[in-house]
Amino acid sequence: MERLKTKIRDIPDFPKPGVLFKDITPLVGDPATLRLAVHQLLHPFLEQDITAVGGIEARGFIFGALVAWELGVGFIPLRKSGKLPYEVRSISYQLEYGSASLEAHTDSLGPGDNVLLVDDLLATGGTAKASCELVESLGATVAACAFVIELDFLHGRERLSDYTVHSLVHY
């Protein structure tokens, strides 16, 4: 996916010193590469019975909503704590320094749902793993996790060893 890589910009020392941020705004700003990314994210799952796409806040919303639209299924936002207005199911997880929570509406998924989780980037896998657990806590099944970017050196795929993982660009 070299074509996608040309539209991912490196921003050194953002959001803090020592971090090399992968900026996807050139990719999503270009219709051809955005379309390519969406089609490559969903392609392995066209023959699966996906009933919903879960997008992980925040950039997973960009790709997840487009993948859901292409598949003709609903989009489920997995949000940071306190961002959803209705009754929620919440899951807490550990970050490198501290903890965080993800939430989904309690009526968004249930038994029989087969969910494709989508995000822009797989790093350590903590947020993705929590997303899988949140989906499963609602009674649904995780079909797979799909990412535009995977930072291989952070070994996030290992935390997702119970799931199918599909990534387009590797660093």
From Swiss-Prot:
Catalyses which reaction(s): AMP + diphosphate = 5-phospho-alpha-D-ribose 1-diphosphate + adenine
This enzyme's EC code(s): 2.4.2.7
This protein's record includes keyword Translocase: no
Compartments where located: Cytoplasm
Any one cellular-component term (Gene Ontology): cytoplasm
Primary location recorded for the protein, binned into one broad class: cytoplasm
Domain of life where this protein originates: Bacteria
Pathway entry: Purine metabolism; AMP biosynthesis via salvage pathway; AMP from adenine: step 1/1
Entry-linked Gene3D superfamilies: 3.40.50.2020
Keyword S-adenosyl-L-methionine applies: no
GO terms (BP aspect): adenine salvage; AMP salvage; purine ribonucleoside salvage
UniProt-listed CDD domains: PRTases_typeI
Functional note: Catalyzes a salvage reaction resulting in the formation of AMP, that is energically less costly than de novo synthesis.
Annotated family: Belongs to the purine/pyrimidine phosphoribosyltransferase family.
HAMAP family cross-referenced by the UniProt entry: Aden_phosphoribosyltr (MF_00004)
Protein name: Adenine phosphoribosyltransferase
Organism whose genome encodes this protein: Nitrosococcus oceani (strain ATCC 19707 / BCRC 17464 / JCM 30415 / NCIMB 11848 / C-107)
Gene: apt
